[in-house]
Amino acid sequence: MDASPLIDIAGWLGVAALLIAYFLVSTQRMEGSSVPYQLLNAGGSGLLILNSYYYGAMPSVGINIAWIAIAIYALSRALQRPVH
């Protein structure tokens, strides 16, 4: 079975997650330091890493590794904050 249709779907879902996160923060409907924002970033980047690696787009893999690392770091900090 050819995996490329599933890889393509994963890539488009990753794009959608990142764009939704950016839209929500840009329209002040979500905080940039919030857990949902960081989850959208990490999930979207993970899906784009899968897609980019499959197609051999290593610069895209690199930027998305950095993106997911930043999201994971921010997520860990957000989860350590006391709840008010």
Model-inferred region functions:
Residues 80-84:
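Short, charged juxtamembrane terminal tails flanking transmembrane helices
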Residues 19-23, 46-53, 72:
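Alpha-helical transmembrane segments of multipass membrane proteins
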Residues 67-76:
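Alpha-helical transmembrane segments and their membrane-interface exit regions
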Residues 4-16, 60-68:
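Structural signature of hydrophobic alpha-helical transmembrane segments
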Residues 56-57:
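Short helix-adjacent coil turns
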Residues 40, 44, 66-67:
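Transmembrane alpha-helical core residues of multi-pass small-molecule transporters
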Residues 26-37:
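Short, amphipathic, aromatic/basic-enriched membrane-interface segments that mark the entry/exit
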